[in-house]
Amino acid sequence: MEEVGLKRILQKLFQHKEIKPLCCVAIEAGPDRKREYGVAGKADYQGLGNRANFYSSFVLQELLPFLYKTYNNLTFTQISIAGFSLGGLSALDIAWKHPGVFEIAGIFSGSLWWRSVDMLDKTYSDDKHRIMHQQIRKGNFQPGLKFFFQCGNMDETEDRNNNGIIDSIDDTLDLIMELEAKGYDKNKDICYYEMPAGRHDMQTWGKAFPVFLKWAFGDKLKG
C-alpha cells in the first residue's frame, strides 16, 4: 500500500480529526490472485477465480481471528472490507455473503464485468452472465450493509455495448441498480464516486481512498 500512500493518508485524516480511530490491515496481492480473487463458488468462463473460496476462508477463518486475538484490548464497532480491481470484486462478494461480519464494502475500479460466458460468444448477455450482478439479484436485502464504489473515466477504453460509456462505469452503475432493486437506498447505503481523470492505477485509488475513509469512518469531532 506504499504506492497508495496509506500511511500518509491515515495520518492526515487522524490529524485533522476527519475519521474515527481504526485498525487498517492490508493483504498482499499474491502471484495467484487471478485465481484467488473473484466470486466464491463461481469461477469465470476461463476458470479464473476458482480459488476464491479459499481466499474468503482465509479472511474469515484466519485473518479476522488473528486480529481479534492480537488486538483483544480493542473493541471493533464496525468492520469494512475493500479492494482494487479484482480485489474490489472479492471485497464485494465477501461482504455480500457475510453481512453479519462486515458492514461496509469498498470497491475501487471493481472488476464487475466478471462473467460466466465470453462476451464474444453470441449467447452472451449482460443481463444473464455478469456473475456478481446475478449474485446480488438472487440474494436478499441485508440491513446495515453499505457500499462504496469508485470508478475513473479513464479506467479503460472498452465499450462493449457502444453506448459511449466505458464498461467499468456501466457495470458499476448496473450493479448499483441491482442493489437498489433489493431495497438499498442510493443516498444512505451507497456512495458512487466517479473521477473524471481516474485511471486503473494505484495513484488514482490513492486519491479516492480518503474519500472512502471519510464516508465510511467519518468523525464528528472536527468543528
Predicted features and spans:
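Non-catalytic cap/lid and distal C-terminal segments of serine-dependent acyl enzymes
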Residues: 1-223
